[in-house]
Amino acid sequence: GVNGLSDALRSAKILTNQLPYNLLWRPIEVEILPKCLKHDIGLICYSPLAQGLLTGRYSSPDNVPDGLSRSRLFSGKRPLAAHGEEGIENETFKAISDIISLANELEEHPAKISLAWLRSRPGITSLLVGARSPEELDLNIPAFEYSLPQSVIDRLSSITQSVKEKLGSNADMWNGNNRMR
């Protein structure tokens, strides 16, 4: 978190910070990202497709396996969730639906525009993208040579703004009591 980053900056020059960041998971934009930008710290983003949510693989919260539905985007009543929060499933899946609609309008895959949005963000140096098959790899690679017009970047940001606001500044995906100092 921002406090841990501040402590580390007093001890050493920090070059990169590895954090979860994607269209649905934007809490780092509140405090951590501005601090990284101020100190020239590059961001390595993990979970850039929100564990597959941004691929359009899941049409509703009920389709998401327990192991993937334990983040604060989902109800704290899910079997493996430990955060104890209400979750924001309705807002999350409304945003996913709107992202898919925009991708269809652009005749692109939602994963491609989601990765391109993330690449467009200030301070991003790398995305840690996983692929379970050659087909997923073929889908992800073109996103690194694809740029979105600013108007589409702004639309995507707007689509997920309510999710961002409900999550607040707690960048901990799994715990409602922010363990990230």
Model-derived features with residue positions:
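Conserved, mostly hydrophobic/aromatic
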Residues: N17, C36, L43-Y46, I99, ...
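Glycine-rich beta-alpha junction loops
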Residues: G1, Y21-P27, S47-Y58, W117, ...
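Short amphipathic alpha-helical segments and helix-helix/interface helices
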Residues: L5, E29-C36, L115, I153
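Glycine/proline-rich, positively charged
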Residues: G1-E31, G42
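Terminal-tail/helix-coil boundary detector
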Residues: K38, D62-S101, E105, S120-T125, ...
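Short, well-ordered coil/turn segments that N-cap beta-strands
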Residues: A12-L15, H39-I41, Y46, G123-T125
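Aromatic-lined glycan-binding groove of carbohydrate-active enzymes
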Residues: I28-F74, H109
